[in-house]
Amino acid sequence: VIFYSNGFEHWLWDDTQCAPRQVQGFFTKDELALLIQRRTSKALLGSVDVNKQIVERYYQHRAITAIGEHFETDKQRKSLLVMATGAGKTRTVVALADLLMRANWAKRVLFLCDRTALVNQAVNAFKTHLPDSSPINLVTESDQDGRVYVSTYQTMVGKIDEYRPDGTRRFGVGHFDLVVIDEAHRSVYRKYRGIFDYF
């Protein structure tokens, strides 16, 4: 893992995983240790089965498999999933998070929505299908810790600058391994780009 900086811009190069990328700061000691530990402990995504108890439809399985291949084989960090209303996007994301957690590719997940009702829906989906992930609704449970955090964009903007009593940021730039953006259209990206750049 290589960090390089000119004092104004910071770049991270995980030389075994992906191309260099600009980051908003340095990882904490714990975040770095996890990044290095994953080099030897993560499983091949193709060797881990999609949980059929979470997603039952063939196209959900195909979407998760394609995203896994995109991350693993193509060494990409971003993916776009487009599904019709009622097609099971939230459950697909829950199953993807489950797969990445079981393969040791992800420890913590951030799920961002534009409305509180969608936050509640996503938290309930994680509680139902992945209860061991300890889903946290950041809109109502702001002081809790878990593996899955669900928030509105507006709430997360405030949480980025939140500090713990010991003076460290609550959410460092390397805190989340998977960030899910629900309803990722241009107006959301333009308005809340700071969140996406930070993580």
PLM region spans:
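ATP-dependent helicase/translocase motor core
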Residues: 1-108, 113, 117-133, 144-148, ...
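Short alpha-helical segments and helix-capping/turn motifs at coil-helix boundaries
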Residues: 133-137, 141, 187-193
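Activation segment
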Residues: 157-160, 188
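SF2 helicase catalytic motif II
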Residues: 167-199
